[in-house]
């Protein structure tokens, strides 16, 4: 499988914004921390046959570097510091940190190395996997089909929102990691730019080239790594929240809630954190139940929910976003991040449900115990038990 050997990626910034935000925080706070991460396909797809093609793309990624115009653009943003950007200018992907193999038909990928470097692999590598697989599986699919599908959905969206005050509806593109292709994502984002409710993209390359607002704060790995960085497991989530505020005291203040379930998060999210963070992001579990819990928590702390933002980003499409908007729009500020249902929405194309998640920090296990049992990831069952005990979690959920 070498007929598509041309590089999929053309820019170091073709990644999610929160990767650079987290990388800067790691650079400043945890320079010597080492991590390991693993690829998971949550579906039944046997992707091992694409291992050689993916490995070839991994090798090509070492040639990506921050260009001068990209450096200047990042320098103009308010939250990046000069020491980090100067280091990023010299950064190169190291393919030796990545092993790719075909394990009896399953695609096996493991990453390991300094966290400050490994952190940048996840999103572009997932985008590479998605695009390579779709090139082979769906050679007939093209950008025009993706755009036609979007236009049809926008017609439905207009009908669905007729007569509804949409002034508080804000949509973001979160579609880099599972996109059909780089070209499809750019075409979809350009079309969405024509809509008044479209406010930005998580992709830094697209944000720069299309003059969009880059969107994103932190991911699960920030909280997972603190499970081993923090000397006290029960305090690890608070330590992660506090360290983020050290790096970004009054910016990038949307906190992800489901690394160790929403209930455990809210127990740690006291009045100081709730006041300083601008809002919360939903990524697993029932979104209405989650939103009601968030609003009730703010009210209990005597914080006006109208001053905070809830970001919904779990398996959304336009219809689901409108349903959530109808339910919550009068009580709290809202944003919606849609990924796969925008950038890999083509007839007869099956999107991949793929992730890369942290499994170790400094040689010790870390875990994600989200509000959706199927999203739990950890090899070490004893550590999962310890984590559940530390955070007083009920109901044992199977770790995968």
From Swiss-Prot:
PTM-bearing positions, type Phosphohistidine: 220
EC code(s) of this entry: 6.3.4.21
Pathway assigned in UniProt: Cofactor biosynthesis; NAD(+) biosynthesis; nicotinate D-ribonucleotide from nicotinate: step 1/1
GO biological process: NAD biosynthetic process via the salvage pathway
Annotated InterPro entries: N/Namide_PRibTrfase, NAPRTase_N, Nic_PRibTrfase, Nic_PRibTrfase-Fam, Nicotinate_pribotase-like_C
Entry GO terms, CC: cytosol
Pfam families: NAPRTase, NAPRTase_N
Single annotated GO MF: nicotinate phosphoribosyltransferase activity
UniProt KW keywords: Ligase, Phosphoprotein, Pyridine nucleotide biosynthesis
Keyword flag Ligase: yes
Function: Catalyzes the synthesis of beta-nicotinate D-ribonucleotide from nicotinate and 5-phospho-D-ribose 1-phosphate at the expense of ATP.
Assigned protein family: Belongs to the NAPRTase family.
Official protein name in the record: Nicotinate phosphoribosyltransferase
């Amino acid at each position: 499988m070498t007929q598509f050997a041309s590089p999929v990626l053309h820019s170091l910034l073709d990644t999610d914004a929160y990767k650079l935000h987290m990388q800067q925080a790691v650079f400043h706070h945890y320079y010597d921390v080492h991590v390991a991460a693993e690829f998971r396909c949550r579906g039944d797809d046997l992707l091992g046959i694409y291992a050689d093609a993916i490995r070839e793309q991994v090798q090509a990624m070492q040639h990506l570097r921050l260009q001068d115009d990209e450096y200047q653009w990042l320098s103009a943003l308010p939250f990046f510091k000069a020491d980090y950007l100067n280091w990023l200018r010299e950064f190169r992907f190291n393919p030796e940190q990545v092993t790719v193999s075909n394990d009896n038909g399953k695609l096996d990928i493991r990453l390991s190395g300094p966290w400050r470097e490994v952190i940048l692999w996840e999103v572009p590598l997932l985008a590479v996997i998605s695009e390579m697989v779709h090139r082979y599986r769906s050679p007939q699919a093209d950008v025009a089909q993706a755009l036609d599908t979007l236009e049809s959905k926008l017609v439905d969206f207009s009908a669905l929102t007729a007569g509804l005050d949409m002034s508080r509806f804000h949509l973001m593109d979160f579609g880099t990691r599972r996109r059909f292709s780089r070209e499809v994502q750019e075409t979809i984002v350009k079309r969405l730019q024509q809509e008044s409710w479209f406010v930005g993209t998580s992709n830094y390359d697209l944000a720069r080239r299309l003059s969009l607002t880059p969107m994103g704060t932190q991911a699960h790995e920030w909280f997972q790594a603190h499970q081993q960085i923090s000397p006290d497991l029960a305090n690890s989530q608070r330590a992660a929240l506090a360290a983020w505020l050290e790096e970004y005291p009054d910016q990038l203040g949307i906190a992800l809630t489901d690394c160790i379930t929403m209930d455990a998060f809210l127990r740690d999210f006291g009045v100081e954190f709730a006041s300083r963070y601008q809002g919360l992001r939903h990524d697993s579990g029932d979104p209405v139940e989650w939103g009601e819990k968030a609003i009730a928590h703010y009210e209990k702390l005597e914080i006006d929910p109208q001053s905070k933002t809830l970001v919904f980003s779990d398996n959304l499409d336009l219809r689901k976003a409108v349903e959530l908007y109808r339910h919550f729009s009068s009580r709290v500020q809202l944003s919606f991040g849609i990924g796969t249902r925008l950038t890999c929405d083509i007839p007869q194309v099956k999107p991949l449900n793929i992730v890369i998640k942290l499994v170790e920090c400094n040689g010790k296990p870390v875990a994600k115990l989200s509000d959706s049992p199927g999203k739990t990831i950890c090899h070490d069952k004893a550590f999962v038990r310890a984590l559940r005990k530390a955070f007083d979690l009920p109901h044992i959920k199977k770790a995968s």
